[in-house]
């Protein structure tokens, strides 16, 4: 796949723009739809900041829907290709049974307390680091954790956007 440039995205009509970047926020193309009107973007970083601002400016209900669109970490259910790849890069698709049970317990405890799944940018993180973060963040207040989860969603989106676009050095890498 040819990576996109900021110029490609600035020239895109709304439909093409949403097709191109609508998946960077998990199951939430509304972020791209609302951000499209902010064109032109000075850079890919500028686009990512505009998308993060769209999330920040959304209603709390819309933000909660965005958080709830994310799968539980380590879950063995259907999820987007992006989530599968990210979780696999951290080894969450290969948890031994005892650790899988620990993750399920942490996920359930977290979701029961906060009303949304634990969210962390896990790409290339270790299972131990992720588990420790889950254990630590369960003690947060709901308001602190809500903001932490939104921040993590923006990190995930930035990493996904980076995969879709031309690197800072301008080289056109080809991806299978």
Curated annotation (Swiss-Prot):
GO terms for molecular function: 2-oxo-4-hydroxy-4-carboxy-5-ureidoimidazoline decarboxylase activity; oxidoreductase activity. The active site is at 70 (proton donor). It comes from the Archaea. The lineage of its organism: Archaea, Methanobacteriati, Methanobacteriota, Stenosarchaea group, Halobacteria. InterPro entries: OHCU_decarboxylase, OHCU_decarboxylase-1, OHCU_decarboxylase_sf. Catalyzes the stereoselective decarboxylation of 2-oxo-4-hydroxy-4-carboxy-5-ureidoimidazoline (OHCU) to (S)-allantoin. Coiled coil: none annotated. It is an enzyme of class 4 (lyase). This is 2-oxo-4-hydroxy-4-carboxy-5-ureidoimidazoline decarboxylase. Pathway: Purine metabolism; urate degradation; (S)-allantoin from urate: step 3/3. The keyword rRNA processing does not apply. Keywords: Decarboxylase, Lyase, Oxidoreductase, Plasmid, Purine metabolism. Its EC number is 4.1.1.97. Gene3D superfamilies: Oxo-4-hydroxy-4-carboxy-5-ureidoimidazoline decarboxylase. Pfam families: OHCU_decarbox. Substrate binds at residues 71, 83-87, 118-122. Residues 72-96 are annotated as: Disordered. It catalyses: 5-hydroxy-2-oxo-4-ureido-2,5-dihydro-1H-imidazole-5-carboxylate + H(+) = (S)-allantoin + CO2. NCBIfam families: UHCUDC (TIGR03164). Belongs to the OHCU decarboxylase family. GO terms for biological process: allantoin metabolic process; purine nucleobase metabolic process; urate catabolic process. The keyword Lyase applies. SUPFAM superfamilies: UraD-Like.
């Amino acid at each position: 796949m040819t990576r996109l440039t900021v110029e490609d995205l600035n020239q895109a009509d709304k439909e093409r723009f949403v097709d191109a970047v609508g998946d960077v926020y998990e199951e939430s193309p509304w972020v791209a739809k609302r951000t499209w009107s902010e064109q032109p973007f000075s850079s890919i970083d500028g686009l990512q900041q505009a998308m993060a601002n769209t999330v920040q400016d959304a209603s709390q209900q819309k933000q909660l829907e965005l958080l709830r669109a994310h799968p539980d970490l380590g879950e063995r259910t259907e999820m987007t290709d992006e989530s599968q790849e990210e979780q696999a890069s951290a080894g969450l698709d290969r948890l031994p049974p005892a650790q899988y049970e620990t993750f399920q317990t942490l996920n359930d405890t977290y979701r029961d307390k906060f009303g949304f799944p634990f969210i962390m940018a896990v790409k290339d993180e270790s299972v131990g680091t992720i588990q420790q973060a889950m254990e630590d963040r369960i003690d947060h207040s709901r308001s602190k954790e809500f903001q932490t989860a939104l921040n993590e969603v923006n990190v995930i989106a930035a990493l996904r956007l980076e995969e879709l676009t031309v690197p800072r050095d301008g080289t056109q890498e080809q991806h299978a």
